[in-house]
């Protein structure tokens, strides 16, 4: 590798390793594989700058070797993290089976971010897997995670994708790739499930490892509080406050998902990050026609993780998290359970609050009235009845110059997937109620519509457009389609001639769209 890339002072590498101060049961040393023929597919220069990395002068080959495992960044100490998880409701021991954590990049502003290779070969937690990843799922994560970032939704980021030049054997032989993921951390609900499963009272182990007699669970909780919730401090009820803080971030996150029509697809407890970021973009997708029962994942045959179920599943996951903390809530088990139940109930209140605020903002409403809940519910019911496109319905409302219910349906800018709804008599009646409510506010209707355009995206990563980009990149080696898509997704709230092609739902084919985990 070029000496330029190996010099920390020249390139901004500032890797730290606070996670390895935890008991050794939480990780294992792991060496990433070296790509035999690394080729840079895409590199996120803007994110690199945000991380304090000065890699603008590096050649594509140098970047390919760096993010293809040929030579690790200076200061890297790769590990695989141990964790467990409830997958589709069933508990299992897991761990990073195809990923390694290189370290924590500390930015010039003092922020700390995990840098992780994904698809980097076998680790001590691989079980029977090969630890590899195919190119299409890695590019898919890059596209969707960067789209979520542009939408303002907390998310992990993607720094680079490198083609390894090696085959990956799944149902078919696929080209392999490695993704470099950036995250606030990779601590999950499943990490705490793992800690609880190995014994909350295993203090002897922690004492040997310099944890001051704390159990691994206690050490993990203290570490996570210090890293992500330092405002909690050393208060007596710090672990209850910790749960509340995690639940608050999850309530905000899931509410944001619901407001943009995002369907994660595999909300297992190992895919709930305690930093409050969206993580693991396997079978995720965005909804076209509104239907709460929408499922895209090929493995979710019973709709456990359907769009409308996501808030309930988040609460279920948090209940599993609360169970891991019971011994820290109180010494008395019944008291601890009561504390956990009360804390969990607060999540539902928080989610409903943030979701209501988000949906009211989508309708240009700046102050809450009880009747607004019915206004939102009635619109969603009509959207489902008329198979209205979720994104385009709200965008069409945002672009309206309506002044009365009578002419409303003809005033909005026509957008694909909305005509049947806007032509319906029931919608005209609803629109009259909504417009009257908008005009009651202490801001002008024009201001309300401008506010709506700032929260209702014109462009989302439409599933068929993502598939087009992946097919061109993987089958033909043509990255221009993905480049155009990423450019459109970078400014999702702006309507331009260039992004017009990205604002239509997929053509009707009669076949439901299906996503796959990619593992």
Report residues per predicted region.
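Regulatory N- and C-terminal appendages and interdomain linkers associated
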Residues: 1-83, 88, 296, 301-519
């Amino acid at each position: 590798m070029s000496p330029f890339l190996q010099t920390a002072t020249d390139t901004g590498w500032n890797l730290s390793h606070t996670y390895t101060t935890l008991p050794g049961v939480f990780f294992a040393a792991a060496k990433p594989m070296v790509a035999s023929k690394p080729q840079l597919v895409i590199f996120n220069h803007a994110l690199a700058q945000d991380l304090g990395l000065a890699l603008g002068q590096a050649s594509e080959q140098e970047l390919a070797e760096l993010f293809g495992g040929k030579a690790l960044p200076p200061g890297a100490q790769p590990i695989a993290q141990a964790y467990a998880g409830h997958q589709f409701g069933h508990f299992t021991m897991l761990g990073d089976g195809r990923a390694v954590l290189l370290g924590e990049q500390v930015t010039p502003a003092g922020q700390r971010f995990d840098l992780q290779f994904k698809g980097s070969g076998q680790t001590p937690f691989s079980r029977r897997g090969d630890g590899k990843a195919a190119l299409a799922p890695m590019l898919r994560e890059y596209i969707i995670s960067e789209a979520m970032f542009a939408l303002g939704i907390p998310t992990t980021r993607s720094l680079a994708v490198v083609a390894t030049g090696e085959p990956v054997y799944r149902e078919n032989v696929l080209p392999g790739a490695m993704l470099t993921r950036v995250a606030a951390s990779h601590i999950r609900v499943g990490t705490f499930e793992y800690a609880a499963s190995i014994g909350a009272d295993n203090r002897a182990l922690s004492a040997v490892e310099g944890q001051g007699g704390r159990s691994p669970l206690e050490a993990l909780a203290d570490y996570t509080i210090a890293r992500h919730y330092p405002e909690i401090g050393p208060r007596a009820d710090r672990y209850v406050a910790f749960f509340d803080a995690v639940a608050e971030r999850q309530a905000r996150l899931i509410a944001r998902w619901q407001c943009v029509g995002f369907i994660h697809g595999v909300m297992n407890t190992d895919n709930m990050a305690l930093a409050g970021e969206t993580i693991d973009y396997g079978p995720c997708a965005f909804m076209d026609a509104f239907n709460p029962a929408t499922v895209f994942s090929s493995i979710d045959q019973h709709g456990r993780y359907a769009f409308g179920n996501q808030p309930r599943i988040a609460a279920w996951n948090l209940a599993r998290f609360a169970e891991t903390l019971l011994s820290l809530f109180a010494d008395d088990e019944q008291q601890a359970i009561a504390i956990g139940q009360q804390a969990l109930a607060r999540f539902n209140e928080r989610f409903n609050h943030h979701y209501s605020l988000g949906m009211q903002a989508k309708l240009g409403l700046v102050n809450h009235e009880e009747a607004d809940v019915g206004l939102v519910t009635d619109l969603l019911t009509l959207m489902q009845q008329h198979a209205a496109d979720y994104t385009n319905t709200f965008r069409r409302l945002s672009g309206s110059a309506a002044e009365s219910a009578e002419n409303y349906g003809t005033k909005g800018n026509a957008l694909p997937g909305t005509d049947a709804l806007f032509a319906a008599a029931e919608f005209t009646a609803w629109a009259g109620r909504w417009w009257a409510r908008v005009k009651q506010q202490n801001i002008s209707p024009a201001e309300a519509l401008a506010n709506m355009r700032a929260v209702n995206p014109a462009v989302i990563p439409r599933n068929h457009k993502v598939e087009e980009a992946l097919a061109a990149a993987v089958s033909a080696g043509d990255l221009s389609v993905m480049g155009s898509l990423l450019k459109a997704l970078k400014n999702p709230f702006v309507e331009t001639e260039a992004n017009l092609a990205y604002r239509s739902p997929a053509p009707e084919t009669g076949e439901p769209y299906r996503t796959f985990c990619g593992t």
